[in-house]
């Protein structure tokens, strides 16, 4: 008997070096079924363009494999280091692009 009944959600904790990914499936009642967790990593020494491309490819692969109904992304918050915020903002843009093309 299939216990999945609701939305499948791709959760994203955005980052350029490490981007957290998870898939959960709504089950019967108020249950949430974990499906997959992972981290998309990009090499720190690679160019910004290469890193963003790798991140885009990783996210589109997850979307293709798990076919989520919706994407939920953690909101970007300032931690005091401007360059970190800017790099994460670039990653967020690529993640939104990948999700919008699914």
Where is each model-derived feature located?
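Phosphate- and other anionic-substrate recognition elements at nucleic-acid/protein interfaces
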Residues: 1-102
């Amino acid at each position: 008997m299939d216990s999945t009944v609701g939305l499948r959600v791709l959760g994203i904790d955005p980052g350029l070096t490490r981007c957290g990914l998870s898939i959960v499936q709504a089950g019967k009642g108020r249950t949430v079924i974990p499906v997959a967790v992972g981290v998309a990593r990009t090499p720190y020494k690679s160019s910004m363009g290469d890193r963003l491309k790798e991140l885009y490819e990783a996210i589109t692969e997850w979307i293709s494999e798990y076919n989520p109904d919706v994407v939920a992304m953690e909101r970007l918050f300032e931690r005091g280091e401007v360059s970190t915020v800017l790099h994460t903002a670039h990653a967020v843009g690529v993640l939104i692009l990948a999700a919008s093309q699914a």
